[in-house]
């Protein structure tokens, strides 16, 4: 089975594109997911994944690239969530839940009438990734990682202690919006591998697993990116070998990593002992 997969990589260009794209998305989603976890915004990935679907539908209606509509609606959703949180007594999780409600059936009907398979939009179809899509994913991934590296310190401060960051003159809201832009970019590019439904799991699960082991944000990001890439490789292998949805296999593999780590991670075991009455 492994030999067949390796032979397929050597023979089929589409499988090479799928592997490179899956690894790129796994790495960048793992890195961005760490900041989402630390900020307590795990629902944001799910909210944006719901928000981009009407953007995809509108793109098909207008006959433009779905990437444009998805990015526009994703950014609009992230801005609205932040605005509602900052200018009302409504908490961010409530705003995220509200913006996750936009009648998916009507948007799905519009997409279903297009030439694109609705199943591929909802659950991804990484085996159909073209050269242009692969290079766009790599370009977005490199840009996102570069921004994180260059602005690591302010992103770190605003994630752990926004009040302290504000007192130090750091523009907390600016970096929050920047992170939302990065999250939207990653969510839209991840549509090709896992689809809109499973984007949140791709963002959160590797980061949550890494959180159980890491003692610093750098180590958490590196481990999360590594786990995301490994889950992508194994998920692609399983999906290709057994002819099942690759996106679901990637997410399921990542979930297995988390479940195993939940029971064996040193930090988790220490926490259990701390909670024990004996």
From Swiss-Prot:
Topology within the bilayer: Multi-pass membrane protein
Entry-linked InterPro entries: ABC_BtuC-like, ABC_TroCD
CDD domains, alphabetized: TM_ABC_iron-siderophores_like
Localization terms from the record: Cell membrane
Cellular component, GO, one term: ATP-binding cassette (ABC) transporter complex
Keywords attached to this entry: Cell membrane, Membrane, Transmembrane, Transmembrane helix, Transport
TM spans (from-to): 18-38, 40-60, 61-81, 136-156, 172-192, 194-214, 220-240, 244-264
Main location, first listed in the record: membrane
GO terms classed as biological process: response to zinc ion; transmembrane transport
Family of this protein: Belongs to the ABC-3 integral membrane protein family.
PANTHER family: ABC-TRANSPORTER METAL-BINDING PROTEIN, IRON TRANSPORT SYSTEM MEMBRANE PROTEIN HI_0360-RELATED
Functional note: Part of an ABC transporter complex involved in manganese import.
Protein name: Manganese import system permease protein ScaB
Lineage of origin: Bacteria, Bacillati, Bacillota, Bacilli, Lactobacillales
